[in-house]
C-alpha cells in the first residue's frame, strides 16, 4: 500500500519552480532518507506532504487522502513531525512530559483538559525512547539533543503512520548526534512502527534501518530507490555533479568525500 503517492507534481511560488515534475511512491514498511544539499527543495517537499503547500500541477495522495478531495485535517493527525519549526513554538517553561503530551493534541500548548492517565502515557512514551531522565525537567533547561529526543517522543504520541525528521541532528555535537541516531533506529523496532522520512544533507547519518533513498537536487528527483541501488559511485557522482569517494563506516554506514 502506498502511503505517499506523487504523480507529475510541480510546485511554483511567485513564478519560481520549487519542485519540478516529481513522481514518487512510499510504501508501508519502507523508511526513506531524503538527501539533498541546501536549497534542493527538501523542506518544500516536506511542507507539501504535510499539506502546508499545495502543488501547482499533478496529483498528491497522502495516507489515502487525495489533495483537493479528502479530509486533510484528519490526514495531518496521522503524521508526526520533528523539526526546528516545531521546537520554536513550544513553551520554554513547560515540563518535559507535558511537552510530549502536546503531541496528542497536535498543538504547542495543552489547550484541553487532561488527566493523570494521559500524562502517564506521555511519561511512558518518553521512557520507551530512552528519555526517562528528562521527566520533571523544564524544556528550556534541556540541551539541544535532549530537546530533539523530547520532540521524537512528542511526535509518536498519536501513533502516527508517518514520522518526518527534518534535519533532526542540526546543532548537535558528535556524541549527541550518534545518540539521537540510535533513538531513531529504535523507532523502527516499536510495535506498529511508523514509516520514517529522514531529511538530511549528511550522508553519514543514513543508518542501517533506512531502506530507501531519494536524491533531490534543485527541486528535481535525480534518483530514488533501495539504498543499495543509490549508494554507488555512478549514481552519487551524477547527483553531486562531482567525483566522490564512498568510505564505509563499520559496514553499515558510509561517508561521502569529494575528490579534490
UniProtKB/Swiss-Prot annotation:
GO terms for molecular function: ATP binding; ATP hydrolysis activity. It comes from the Bacteria. ATP binds at residues 36-43. Keywords: ATP-binding, Nucleotide-binding, Transport. Residues 4-243 form the ABC transporter domain. InterPro entries: AAA+_ATPase, ABC_transporter-like_ATP-bd, ABC_transporter-like_CS, Metal_Ion_Import_ABC, P-loop_NTPase. PROSITE patterns: ABC_TRANSPORTER_1, ABC_TRANSPORTER_2. Gene3D superfamilies: P-loop containing nucleotide triphosphate hydrolases. Belongs to the ABC transporter superfamily. This is Putative ABC transporter ATP-binding protein. It comes from Streptococcus mutans serotype c (strain ATCC 700610 / UA159). The gene is abcX.
Amino acid at each position: 500500500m502506498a502511503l505517499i503517492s506523487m504523480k507529475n507534481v510541480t510546485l511554483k511560488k511567485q513564478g519560481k519552480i520549487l519542485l519540478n515534475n516529481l513522481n514518487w511512491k512510499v510504501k508501508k514498511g519502507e523508511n526513506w532518507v531524503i538527501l539533498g544539499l541546501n536549497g534542493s527543495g527538501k523542506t518544500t517537499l516536506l511542507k507539501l506532504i504535510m499539506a502546508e503547500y499545495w502543488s501547482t500541477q499533478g496529483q498528491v495522495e497522502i495516507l489515502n487522502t487525495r489533495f483537493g478531495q479528502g479530509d486533510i485535517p484528519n490526514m495531518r493527525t496521522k503524521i508526526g513531525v520533528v523539526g526546528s519549526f516545531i521546537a520554536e513554538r513550544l513553551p520554554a517553561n513547560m515540563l518535559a512530559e507535558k511537552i510530549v503530551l502536546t503531541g496528542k493534541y497536535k498543538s504547542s500548548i495543552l489547550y484541553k483538559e487532561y488527566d493523570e492517565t494521559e500524562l502517564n502515557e506521555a511519561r511512558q512514551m518518553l521512557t520507551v525512547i530512552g528519555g526517562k531522565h528528562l521527566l520533571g525537567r523544564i524544556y528550556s533547561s534541556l540541551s539541544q539533543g535532549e530537546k530533539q529526543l523530547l520532540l521524537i517522543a512528542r511526535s509518536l504520541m498519536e501513533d502516527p503512520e508517518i514520522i518526518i525528521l527534518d534535519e533532526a541532528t542540526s546543532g548537535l555535537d558528535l556524541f549527541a548526534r550518534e545518540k539521537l541516531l540510535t533513538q531513531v533506529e529504535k523507532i523502527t523496532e516499536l510495535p506498529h512502527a511508523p514509516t520514517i522520512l529522514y531529511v538530511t544533507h549528511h550522508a553519514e547519518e543514513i543508518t542501517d534501518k533506512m531502506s530507501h533513498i531519494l536524491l533531490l537536487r534543485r527541486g528535481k528527483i535525480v534518483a530514488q530507490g533501495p539504498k543499495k541501488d543509490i549508494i554507488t559511485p555512478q549514481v552519487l557522482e551524477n547527483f553531486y555533479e562531482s567525483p566522490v569517494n564512498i568510505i564505509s563506516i563499520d559496514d553499515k554506514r558510509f561517508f561521502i568525500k569529494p575528490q579534490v
